[in-house]
Regions:
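Hydrophobic anchor at the beta1->P-loop junction of P-loop NTPases
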Residues: 13
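Conserved lysine of the Walker
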Residues: 21
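NTP-dependent small-molecule kinase module
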Residues: 2-6, 129-181
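Conserved nucleotide-sensing/catalytic segment adjacent to the nucleotide-binding pocket
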Residues: 34-91
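The conserved Walker
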Residues: 17
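Hydrophobic positions on the alpha1 helix immediately C-terminal to the Walker A/P-loop
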Residues: 24
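A glycine- and Lys/Arg-enriched "phosphate-lid" helix/loop adjacent to the NTP-binding pocket
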Residues: 88-138, 172, 180
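Walker A (P-loop) ATP-phosphate-binding motif of ABC ATPase nucleotide-binding domains
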Residues: 10
Length: 181
C-alpha cells in the first residue's frame, strides 16, 4: 500500500444519499484491512442502541465509518483521522437513487419484506425523492466539515466524480495479505 497507512486507520465517509458510500466504504475497508462500520445497520439514529453501537465500534483501531455520524459527532469525530466526501453531481445521485429503488421494487423480496413494502424505497431515505429533497442541504452541511470543531487537524478528501474516487482507491495499492497483480 502506498502512502502513510497509519493516516488511513480511522475514516468517515460522507456524501448524499445515493453517492455510493456503502459500496466505497466496504472496498476501502477491505483495501486497508480495516473494519467497515455501516451506520444504517447500527440501529435507529439517536436510539440508545445506536449510540452504544457507535461508541463500541469506534473504540477500535482501524475502521471505515460509512455515513455521517449523526447524534454521535462528539464520539466519532475526535477519533477520526480522515473524512472522505463523495461530492457527486445531482444527476448522478438521482440516477443511482432511481436504480436502487427499481432494484428493490422489482427484485426479490428482502427477508421480512412484504409486497407492499416494495414501493417505500421511492420515498425512503436513500430513495430518489428523498435524495433530491436533501441534496443541497447535505452538500452545504458537508461543505462545513472543515470548520467542525471536532475535526480540527483532520484530513478532508473531497472527490467530485466516481472515477476520481476509484483512481484514488486504486492508488492505495493491494489489500493487505493479497498478492499484487
Amino acid at each position: 500500500m502506498t502512502g502513510d497507512s497509519e493516516l488511513f486507520a480511522r475514516i468517515v465517509v460522507v456524501g448524499c444519499p445515493g453517492a455510493g458510500k456503502t459500496r466505497f466504504s466496504a472496498r476501502l475497508a477491505r483495501r486497508l484491512g480495516a473494519r467497515h462500520i455501516e451506520r444504517d445497520r447500527l440501529g435507529a439514529l439517536g436510539s440508545k442502541e445506536f449510540c452504544a453501537a457507535v461508541a463500541a465500534t469506534v473504540a477500535g483501531d482501524r475502521w471505515v465509518f460509512d455515513g455521517p455520524p449523526y447524534f454521535m459527532e462528539a464520539v466519532v469525530y475526535p477519533a477520526t483521522q480522515v473524512v472522505i466526501w463523495l461530492d457527486y453531481r445531482r444527476s448522478l445521485i438521482l440516477t443511482r437513487g432511481i436504480r436502487r429503488a427499481l432494484r428493490r421494487t422489482i427484485g426479490p423480496l428482502e427477508p421480512g419484506q412484504s409486497f407492499g413494502d416494495r414501493f417505500r424505497h421511492w420515498v425512503a431515505p436513500g430513495g430518489p425523492r428523498f435524495a433530491m429533497a436533501v441534496y443541497t442541504q447535505r452538500r452545504q452541511e458537508f461543505g462545513r466539515l472543515r470548520r467542525h470543531p471536532g475535526l480540527a487537524g483532520v484530513v478532508v478528501l473531497r472527490f467530485g466524480t466516481p472515477s476520481a474516487t476509484a483512481a484514488w482507491l486504486a492508488a492505495l495499492g493491494s489489500p493487505p495479505d493479497s498478492p499484487a497483480c
